[in-house]
A protein has these predicted regions:
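Short, non-ligating residues that shape and space the ligands of small metal-coordination modules
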Residues: 50-51
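Bacterial N-terminal signal peptides
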Residues: 9-18
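Short, cysteine/histidine-rich loop/knuckle motifs that typically chelate Zn2+
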Residues: 43
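Conserved catalytic-core motifs of eukaryotic protein kinase domains, centered on the activation segment
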Residues: 54-56
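Bacterial N-terminal signal peptides that target proteins for export
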Residues: 2-9
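Conserved beta-strand positions that form and line the central face of beta-propeller blades
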Residues: 63-64, 86
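Sec/Tat signal peptide C-region and signal peptidase I cleavage site
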Residues: 18-24
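Flexible coil segments in periplasmic/lumen-exposed cytochrome c-class electron-transfer proteins
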Residues: 25-29, 37-39, 47, 85-168
C-alpha cells in the first residue's frame, strides 16, 4: 500500500510539472525560450504572439493568437518563411530544394523570404517552437491577465491591463 501511495504521488507530481497540454515541461521551456530569445519571434510577433512587435520591427506580423495554423503548417512557415513577406526562413537549406512550398529560390525569382538576421534553427528547435505555439499561443484569442502573469511574472503591473479569466 505504501508503494502504491508513493507511486500515485509521483504520478501526480509528474502531471503537475507538465504545462497542461501534453508537452513535457523541458520541451515547453525550450520552445518558449526559442520564441522569446533564440529566434526572437517576439521582436515582430510580440511577446504574447499578438502581432504587436517592438517598434523597430518591420510591422505587419501575424497575430498568432488568432491563427488557425496546425503543427505541420507552422513548421513549414517557421522553416520556410513566407515568400514576398517579411517573415524570415529559419531552415538554412530553405529553397535549395523543393522542401519549401514545392519550389526553389530560382523559381521564386528573388521573392525568397529574408534570411534570419542572426540565426537558423535545427529541425528539432523548429518542432519545439511549433509545439510551444500550439500549446500556448495559436488560437488562444485575446491575452488574459493570467497568461500575462504566467509569462512576465506576478509583479508586472501592465498585466492588470488585461482582462481576468471569468467563469463558473
Amino acid at each position: 500500500m505504501r508503494n502504491r501511495s508513493r507511486n500515485l504521488v509521483l504520478l501526480a507530481l509528474t502531471l503537475l510539472a507538465q504545462p497542461g497540454n501534453g508537452l513535457a515541461a523541458d520541451d515547453f521551456a525550450a520552445g518558449r525560450r526559442i520564441f522569446l530569445e533564440k529566434a526572437d519571434c517576439a521582436y515582430c510577433h510580440g511577446w504574447a504572439g499578438d502581432g504587436a512587435g517592438q517598434g523597430q520591427s518591420p510591422g505587419g506580423a501575424a497575430n498568432l493568437r488568432a491563427s488557425r495554423l496546425d503543427r505541420d503548417s507552422l513548421i513549414m512557415v517557421i522553416s520556410c518563411g513566407i515568400p514576398g513577406r517579411a517573415m524570415p526562413h529559419f531552415d538554412d537549406q530553405a529553397y535549395t530544394d523543393r522542401r519549401c512550398y514545392g519550389t526553389t529560390e530560382a523559381e521564386l525569382g528573388g521573392r525568397v523570404p529574408p534570411f534570419p538576421p542572426s540565426t537558423t534553427l535545427p529541425r528539432r528547435d523548429i518542432e519545439l517552437l511549433a509545439d510551444y505555439l500550439i500549446a500556448k499561443v495559436i488560437g488562444r484569442g485575446p491575452l488574459t491577465r493570467e497568461e500575462c502573469m504566467e509569462t512576465l511574472g506576478e509583479r508586472v503591473r501592465s498585466c492588470s491591463d488585461y482582462p481576468a479569466i471569468t467563469g463558473p
